[in-house]
Amino acid sequence: MTELGMMLLSRVRIALRVGLPALQRRLPDPWDVHPDSRDASQGANLAVLFYEIFLNQTAEGLELTTADALGRYFVLGIPSRHRRTEETAFMVFRIFTAHPTGENPFGWNRIAAGRTTVHANIVRSHTVEANNLEAMVSDRIEAHLDKGVVALELRYRRGVPKRVASEGRVRFTAESEHVRVYRADELVDVVKSVPAAVDRLEGFGLRVTLPELTDIFDGSEQVVNLTVQPWFLRRVYAPSGG
């Protein structure tokens, strides 16, 4: 495997349960929807993620432009499994990015160009109200496009995060033959988990008005898990030939 570089970021991850047909038709053959089996998000079949990138660095240490070194974007993806090989991967089908030219995220240069990632005007308001060791966090994030908006609003009591090491495989539905391997060292604060009976969420709203996503966000979606990752160090790798 070839190391492409690293990313230092924070992330909000919302795991949802939505209608299966709308997801399956977005996957290339021979991939199938494979709901999350992890304890905190068991049964979820869609993830909506917001990334705040503090720094991207190439493996060679090359200096990147501001637009490439920093970033804000929403990612929509489906936990999936290959029908024949049984490989599991997170299949990304749409990214809304603040990058001025709508470039793919770091590590995906020229892959599925123009078919997965689109530019959006992304605004964020993040506040913390702290009293001794207690903290209440309010976060509002919006991605504005010509045809609609993705708007996320949450208010929660901050918990004590766990430090976790993880590894996962990511593909784009538009060119699923390419794969990236992400190895991460992260802090994980599970704010809400239906399977684990955790709920420190004081307020929540997710509004998606884009026509291309109305078959997914039809009002029947259910939140299974909401996790905040205030610190996330990810190394990005490309397998040989990937």
Where are these regions (language model features)?
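Interaction-surface and assembly-scaffold signal
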Residues: 104-242
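Aromatic- and glycine-enriched beta-alpha-beta binding-site module
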Residues: 53-140
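Hydrophobic, proline/glycine-rich low-complexity stretches
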Residues: 1-59, 200-242
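Hydrophobic beta-strand residues in large extracellular and virion-surface proteins
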Residues: 48, 76-78, 154
